[in-house]
Amino acid sequence: MGQIFSRSASPIPRPPRGLAAHHWLNFLQAAYRLEPGPSSYDFHQLKKFLKIALETPVWICPINYSLLASLLPKGYPGRVNEILHILIQTQAQIPSRPAPPPPSSSTHDPPDSDPQIPPPYVEPTAPQVLPVMHPHGAPPNHRPWQMKDLQAIKQEVSQAAPGSPQFMQTIRLAVQQFDPTAKDLQDLLQYLCSSLVASLHHQQLDSLISEAETRGITGYNPLAGPLRVQANNPQQQGLRREYQQLWLAAFAALPGSAKDPSWASILQGLEEPYHAFVERLNIALDNGLPEGTPKDPILRSLAYSNANKECQKLLQARGHTNSPLGDMLRACQAWTPKDKTKVLVVQPKKPPPNQPCFRCGKAGHWSRDCTQPRPPPGPCPLCQDPTHWKRDCPRLKPTIPEPEPEEDALLLDLPADIPHPKNSIGGEV
């Protein structure tokens, strides 16, 4: 089945292209709950299956793990089926909030078939993130941070704001794997966040710890010191888990970014598929919105207002300007750049002319289709011959010397006049 996956090598494996980070972290948390632990082969098969499943993104908006499990082929290799089973069980255990009843009106109710009136919005029942859960009965798995672990975590949250779903899911996954103490969490906070964010987090954490100590925690002994000190003991696994939950909850009170949100300026390109545009919006909202902020109303509003004109016309024609996101995706599913075929204007061919060609004098073809070379416009400027161009003039060609007669060739072999030697005294010999 492959070698057991080493958790110290990379705490957060890379997600497949096109899948939001918080969805991928849910799959990772479910995979780490397997007993025995997942292998690298399991992660490879999980990525391979998710790439195939992303071709039908209906199960994402909202996410439905039962529908995703129905797309899994029978006998699929790896432990993908077990991972999906854990996600389905976790999704069923978390109670969903009931949808608010529609407001009753004393007057007549509008008909359901009116396309101008959007249907009432129903809150998604699927959880956006999974809580930190450890295998039941597992021994303490505390491991101090290493610099490569901190660098890998910081790289994952570099594009996410503190308190956003992607930031929180990454931190939850790191807490689940390393089971850090209070001192480890303080080091992680100082490494990831600025001094201002760390100060605000520290104030909120102190208030949460005071409330928890007043309320009472299982295993907490006031005579043994504050909760922060007792959570540093690796043997106090229960108190350490309580402190981890309080430390994560302190991020909920952090203020958002003061600058204009980047997701408000995301527009759909003229040739961009609609589902790719919605996925970009979804990822940007995950990175920018603080945890607990309802994302779906903002996503549905931007999915219509920031779409291109053609997709807006499709949504208006089908009455899905404020519908659930799945209906909007299905409405624009048929519109893709591949379907926009170019209309070519084909001119009918003219019949061959009956008149003779201007070049060769034969009938049955046009002069532009004639195979004869084009005649020169006038006589050659060198030799005044009207039958050829200047580039073909014989005067421009190099002249070949004529062969000499045979007698002259024989004379060339004879020596030339030999100079007579002179005496040293003077005079010829």
Swiss-Prot record:
**Motif PTAP/PSAP motif: where in chain:** 124-127
Give the lipid-moiety residues, type N-myristoyl glycine.
G2
Please give the InterPro entries that the UniProt record associates with this protein: D_retro_matrix, Gag_p24_C, Primate_lentivir_Gag_pol-like, Retrov_capsid_C, Retrov_capsid_N, Retrovr_matrix, Znf_CCHC, Znf_CCHC_sf
Does the entry feature the keyword Ubl conjugation, yes or no? Answer: yes
Give the record's keywords alphabetically: Capsid protein, Disulfide bond, Host-virus interaction, Lipoprotein, Metal-binding, Myristate, Phosphoprotein, Repeat, Ubl conjugation, Viral nucleoprotein, Virion, Zinc, Zinc-finger
Q: Where is this site: Cleavage?
A: L130, P131, L344, V345
What biological-process terms (Gene Ontology) are attached? Answer: viral translational frameshifting
What are the record's GO terms for cellular component?
viral nucleocapsid
- CCHC-type zinc fingers: which residues? 355-372, 378-395
Tell me where in this chain the PTM Phosphoserine is found: S105
Which GO terms label this protein's molecular function in UniProt? nucleic acid binding; structural molecule activity; zinc ion binding
Q: Which domain of life is it from?
A: Viruses
Residue numbers spanned by region Disordered? 93-142
Residue numbers of motif PPXY motif?
Answer: 118-121
| Misc. comment | HTLV-1 lineages are divided in four clades, A (Cosmopolitan), B (Central African group), C (Melanesian group) and D (New Central African group).
What PANTHER family does UniProt report for this protein, alphabetically?
Answer: ENDOGENOUS RETROVIRUS GROUP K MEMBER 24 GAG POLYPROTEIN-RELATED (PTHR40389), IGE-BINDING PROTEIN (PTHR40389:SF3)
Tell me the protein's name: Gag polyprotein
What is the scientific name of the source organism? Human T-cell leukemia virus 1 (isolate Caribbea HS-35 subtype A)
The top of its lineage is: Viruses, Riboviria, Pararnavirae, Artverviricota, Revtraviricetes
